[in-house]
Design a protein with these regions (language model features):
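Nucleic acid-binding interface residues in structured DNA/RNA-binding domains
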Residues: 1-96
Length: 96
C-alpha cells in the first residue's frame, strides 16, 4: 500500500471517479485501511469532492440525512435506510 500523501491522493482520486447515481464503500477506496479513507475524506476541504457517494460496507450512511438527500437527488436507490448496493455499487479502479 502506498503511504502518506500518495495514499491520500489515490483515495481522493477514487472518490472523484464515482459517477453520479452510484456509490463506493470506504473499503473500496482503501481495502487495507477503510478507516484511513474516512479520515482522509474528513480532513479534505474541497467543496467539489463527492463525499456523499461513499458509504459503509453494508450500504448504511456515515453522515445521515444530508447524505441521503444528496444521493436521492442523484437517483441512488435505497432499501430502507441503506443504499441498495446491488444496484448502485461502482467498482472503483486505480489500485491504492
Amino acid at each position: 500500500m502506498a503511504g502518506g500523501r500518495d495514499l491520500e491522493a489515490q483515495i481522493l482520486r477514487r472518490v472523484r471517479s464515482i459517477p453520479p447515481g452510484f456509490v463506493a464503500t470506504y473499503g473500496d477506496l482503501c481495502p487495507e485501511a477503510p478507516r484511513r479513507a474516512g479520515a482522509v475524506m474528513a480532513s479534505n476541504d474541497d467543496p467539489g469532492l463527492p463525499w456523499h457517494r461513499v458509504v459503509r460496507a453494508d450500504g448504511s450512511l456515515a453522515v445521515g440525512e444530508r447524505q441521503r438527500r444528496l444521493l436521492e437527488a442523484e437517483g441512488v436507490p435505497f432499501r430502507g435506510h441503506r443504499v441498495d448496493l446491488r444496484e448502485a455499487w461502482f467498482a472503483v479502479e486505480d489500485s491504492v
